[in-house]
Amino acid sequence: MLARTVLRSVPFRGVARQSLNKTSTRASSSAAGAESASSPFHLTLTASAATAVALGSAAYLYGQEAFAMTPAEEGLHPTAYPWEHAKWNKTFDHQALRRGFQVYREVCASCHSLTRVPWRSFVGVMHTVDEMKAMAEENEYDTEPNDQGEIEKRPGKLSDYIPAPYKNEEAARAANGGALPPDLSLIVKGRHGGCNYIFSLLTGYPDEPPAGATVGAGMNFNPYFPGTAIAMGRVLFDGVVEYEDGTPATTSQMAKDVVEFLNWAAEPEMDDRKKMGVKAITLLTGLFAISVWVKRYKWSPIKTRKIVYSPPVSRR
Amino acid sequence: MRILKSHPLLKIVNSYMIDSPQPANISYLWNFGSLLALCLGIQIVTGVTLAMHYTPSVLEAFNSVEHIMRDVNNGWLVRYLHANTASAFFFLVYLHIGRGLYYGSYKSPRTLTWAIGTVILIVMMATAFLGYVLPYGQMSLWGATVITNLMSAIPWIGQDIVEFIWGGFSVNNATLNRFFALHFLLPFVLAALALMHLIAMHDTVGSGNPLGISGNYDRLPFAPYFIFKDLVTIFIFFIVLSIFVFFMPNALGDSENYVMANPMQTPPAIVPEWYLLPFYAILRSIPNKLLGVIAMFSAILALMVMPITDLSKLRGVQFRPLSKVAFYIFVANFLVLMQIGAKHVETPFIELGQISTVLYFAHFFVIVPVVSLIENSLVELATKK
């Protein structure tokens, strides 16, 4: 469009005729100039077509999604929930974290490990030192080899990590019909959809698979899981956990709490990060404002200068 | 004489950053250079810090990165800065190149600066790719597998070269170790190249300007005018970077890379980071593997022909409306390619990718020379009465 308008303002035929005559002097740098320069209208057309193709394909591409897999293989896209802790100016709800940890301990921990989270990291976040020490001591850990080279057992310390439910991957697979329950330390960061996906998965088990859906033996139907057949069954039912703070333990409440807890497990630095972010943005905005002021202060004489041309005057 | 002008080292600083006379009319689009230098600085400082805690071993790499994220004081800040500044680096370098294309910065006498700049882009991409492998998540491993396998397209010796790069028969511990060593080395090569880039410009005619004419009619010293002008964009850059680092640090990353590398399981889609997508799209648009690899590398090297194929007598496109249209089509096409690079290989994206690839190369080899010749003619006709 623009190209056409631009070219329309130029007398076409005159251009074409004259440019043919002037080719030798004008396009000394290239021999290709003669035939191309003689037909600017074709080029306008090409340019317009190219613009149309580029803009059209851009609109087309941004407008739709491609799926290499069928919707079932892809898994149902989770609903976007308004997570309070995901907002830029919000921290984790630490009571929810505490409830979520209770759900993890009483429900998830029988199959899923949380190997990157040590007992110490709970202190000051959702539990007191004494609570965590007691919790750590409930577990046994191997000692260093003693003088005889024997490895003994000792109660856990704050510096220990949460023990895994199975000795190794093979044991985990053997106990779960060949499926490996993934470690949950990074699950929120390591899955497309993050919190929304985990929440949808936990609460998305239908009572029965929909008509037409086939699920293999020992598998369960969940529309949010890629492939829809998941080895894990529905684990959250109303009242399966009794919250110590009296919150009614509905399925969605537990799912929400445990997702927030797993988000903390994946990003324990989030509260600090956002707090530091607010400080950084505040500070930098101030510095930016000052820098704009200094720049204008330094440049104002340049921007407001007047350049005068005094023609030479003959003095005779 | 002032020590700034007589001291053998300080006088270099003086001639580059203090007294250095710059054209008075350069716009804010001339600020990307200082921002890119800042990016390189941030990357080297954060990178060296990360290297103090990182373990380049297939068994421990992922764990050591998580150790940095969880246990090292402010380790998350250092790593998120490193990861997001890499994206910012490419975002700015594309703007910097776009500025060069728009204002004809590649034209003589700045061809050497432009050529070094193209080499810098290639080294940057290599460095970014090597760095992305280091956390050794799923996308690290499989990205490394895909990209190193490109070399197998070389006739006769391709497979041998790939195994030489791997140091084995697949991406393994030796690969990770050498990638770490090279990722540590290349930023310093980049710094040297950036210095060459600067010297090549400084010792010819210095910065161009938006009018495309000589800058000698009106110049201002670098200090204080351009130091304070650069500072404005530096703070804007820090604000935007902070928004990413502190509030959405993983927005530009792939969640697949928070899953530990598993050679037994291929992720559903192997996608490079956003800044490599246009070239990945060009690679995938060519049905032949060898030609695809050649096309991908040529796509970057095509920048080098700009000084030759732009036959215009004017510097830059600001007074050449046809070229302006061609420039914006090129930019739109680049963004289209970036989208296509992230799509699965299937109709219609294959065909669109091929059209975009043709348009990409046509810009450098056909559109620019033809349009510049037409404009030469028009200018000549208009000025000759």
From Swiss-Prot, chain B:
Gene: cob
Protein name: Cytochrome b
Residues annotated as binding heme b b566: H96, H197
Disulfide pairings: none
One of the Pfam families matching this protein, by short name: Cytochrom_B_C
Spans through the membrane: 32-52, 76-98, 113-133, 179-199, 226-246, 290-310, 322-342, 349-369
Cofactor section: heme b
InterPro entries: Cyt_b/b6_C, Cyt_b/b6_C_sf, Cyt_b/b6_N, Cytb/b6-like_sf, Cytochrome_b, Cytochrome_b_C_euk/bac, Cytochrome_b_N_euk/bac, Di-haem_cyt_TM
Cellular component annotations (GO), alphabetically ordered: mitochondrial inner membrane; respiratory chain complex III
Protein's organism: Aspergillus tubingensis
Assembly behavior: Fungal cytochrome b-c1 complex contains 10 subunits; 3 respiratory subunits, 2 core proteins and 5 low-molecular weight proteins. Cytochrome b-c1 complex is a homodimer.
GO terms for MF: metal ion binding; ubiquinol-cytochrome-c reductase activity
General function of this protein: Component of the ubiquinol-cytochrome c reductase complex (complex III or cytochrome b-c1 complex) that is part of the mitochondrial respiratory chain. The b-c1 complex mediates electron transfer from ubiquinol to cytochrome c. Contributes to the generation of a proton gradient across the mitochondrial membrane that is then used for ATP synthesis.
